[in-house]
Amino acid sequence: MTLQRTPLHDLAIAAGAKFVPFSGWEMAVQYKGLKVEHQAVRTEVGMFDISHMGKFQLAGENLIAAMQKLVPSNLARLAPGQAQYTVLLNDHGGIIDDVIYYHQGDRQGFLIVNAATTQKDWDWLTHHLTAQGITLTDVSQENILLAIQGPQAEKALQPVVENLDLATLKLFNHGQGQIFGETAFIARTGYTGEDGFEVMVAPTAGKKLWSALIDAGVMPCGLGARDTLRLEAGLHLYGQDMDDDTTPLEAGLGWLIHWQEKDAFIAKDILQTQKAAGVQRRLVGLEMQGRGIARHDYSVLVNGEAVGLVTSGTMSPTLEKAIALAYLPLEFSKVGQAVTVEIRGKQYPAQVVKKPFYRASKK
């Protein structure tokens, strides 16, 4: 299969990128190195080419009412210019994908979805929304999407943005500005646990933006650092930490369900039943107590008996400890629970800890 490339591919090569296949795309996994990229985002600023992600424009008279049926979060409380992280639910209460919905007014909205699930999401949304008179436009290939992340993100980005004061954008707010003569969609969102922005703009201006930020000393970062940053921040990766068979309650995303604010939505009854009965498993944080790094699909044991599976794991550059996410039965999910992780036939001690593993200091 031929891998797709983003419009910034040649610029990534020039910046020294090493590439790997990811969800049908040839993506930069690192530039100068995972640790230095990770550190740049935690202490200063780094940028990620995330143009591979799915981007859908939604329009229609009853847009909010139609979307309300597909997600457990109350989108009706959003004002234009605000955004909501939420999940698309299937008929069984499982998570089709985690997405960000950007409210642009009563008749307009925008969705950014995961690259691996772009077609699945499109099929689900068109099936449910077109009958409600909603028009969907897939603009995934039309624009670049660049994430500028870190404590110095605002300072780095503002010089190339006109007609928008980034300081006025609160977390999970978005607006329009001008970047190199093109209208740009700019949101104060991210996937690193740090302050930052995600910028969508036409490729010509996007290439100029990349080059301008490189010239300003912003470090290009790859998927490797993106993964360690999000894991330290306790953020989920769809397809590993949750999937079609995982409910928001199991995944620790119950806070996305606005029970009292919403009428019917897909699988509400199923989720209410699960909430009343209690979940049987829960996504927890693990910290290794010595050597060994827990990786995806490694077994978690209690008293020598396998009770769960690791979904994501890495060596944390910030904490200098091995950390992981894992699903464990409720009785073994409390903070302080001692477990072991089987790594290449040997058991290594670990402990259930509070999530997130890292929290950025507030501005």
From Swiss-Prot:
- Role of this protein: The glycine cleavage system catalyzes the degradation of glycine.
The reaction(s) catalysed by this protein are: N(6)-[(R)-S(8)-aminomethyldihydrolipoyl]-L-lysyl-[protein] + (6S)-5,6,7,8-tetrahydrofolate = N(6)-[(R)-dihydrolipoyl]-L-lysyl-[protein] + (6R)-5,10-methylene-5,6,7,8-tetrahydrofolate + NH4(+)
* Entry protein name: Aminomethyltransferase
> In the UniProt record, what gene is named as encoding this protein?
gcvT
Q: Which GO terms describe its biological process?
A: glycine decarboxylation via glycine cleavage system
Q: How does it assemble?
A: The glycine cleavage system is composed of four proteins: P, T, L and H.
| Alphabetized SUPFAM superfamilies for the sequence | Aminomethyltransferase beta-barrel domain, Folate-binding domain
PANTHER family in UniProt = AMINOMETHYLTRANSFERASE, AMINOMETHYLTRANSFERASE, MITOCHONDRIAL
Q: What class of enzyme is it?
A: transferase
Which GO molecular function annotations are given, in alphabetical order?
A: aminomethyltransferase activity; transaminase activity
| Source organism per UniProt | Picosynechococcus sp. (strain ATCC 27264 / PCC 7002 / PR-6) (Agmenellum quadruplicatum)
Q: What is the lineage of its organism?
A: Bacteria, Bacillati, Cyanobacteriota, Cyanophyceae, Oscillatoriophycideae
Q: Name one GO cellular component term.
A: cytosol
Q: Pfam families annotated for this entry?
A: GCV_T (PF01571), GCV_T_C (PF08669)
The catalytic activity of this protein is classed by the Enzyme Commission as: 2.1.2.10
Source domain of life is: Bacteria
Q: Does the keyword Zinc-finger apply?
A: no
- InterPro entries linked: GCS_T, GCS_T_bac, GCST_C, GCV_T_N, GcvT/YgfZ/DmdA, GcvT/YgfZ_C, TrmE/GcvT_dom1
Q: Which UniProt keywords apply?
A: Aminotransferase, Transferase
